[in-house]
């Protein structure tokens, strides 16, 4: 099984796209210093379970692309590590070194590793998913616990979380969200993303975002409904 010169898949055309660092944090949280063998086994086991003939593991190459759009992107994360002890710093360095070892092992076994300067793993995933028909890809499985990847879900694109051990697909979408899949971007715009330091509407979190979508519809519907007469300040902020 290999890519042809045209970049298309031959033989088994199902594709596994792995959020490389996201999956590695599974061992970071368990404080396991040496996890290369387990990491490789996990990836190959998932490829077998989902009958994927090609595996692409994605790595973050920085956030330049996103920071050019929004300079405050992830600015809140600097404080997270400023009070680290020397022992904690060494532990994290060991984690990253083992992550590099795992990547090399996977590459030596013939799996694709993709990392591009200025782009994060989900930027690359979005590009690959967008090009999947050109590459002759059949079914695609995204391996990440990051729910932002759900923006990519389609009839032939699904996500599996190694943290919750649950799948998110177009067929079980309503088990995970209280709004239709095409409202996912509206949800993110309203609620923002505190982890990435991206503000949403003042006073609007996930629950209130769901309520607004249920009552008014997508972002354009909400915009067209403004100004909305309400006693609630978060609605007045719209």
Question: What kind of region is each of these model predictions?
Answer:
Residues 2-7, 13, 80-238:
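Extended two-metal-dependent nuclease catalytic cores across DNA- and RNA-processing enzymes
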Residues 1-109:
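Domain-level signal for Mg2+-assisted phosphodiester chemistry and nucleotide/NA-binding surfaces
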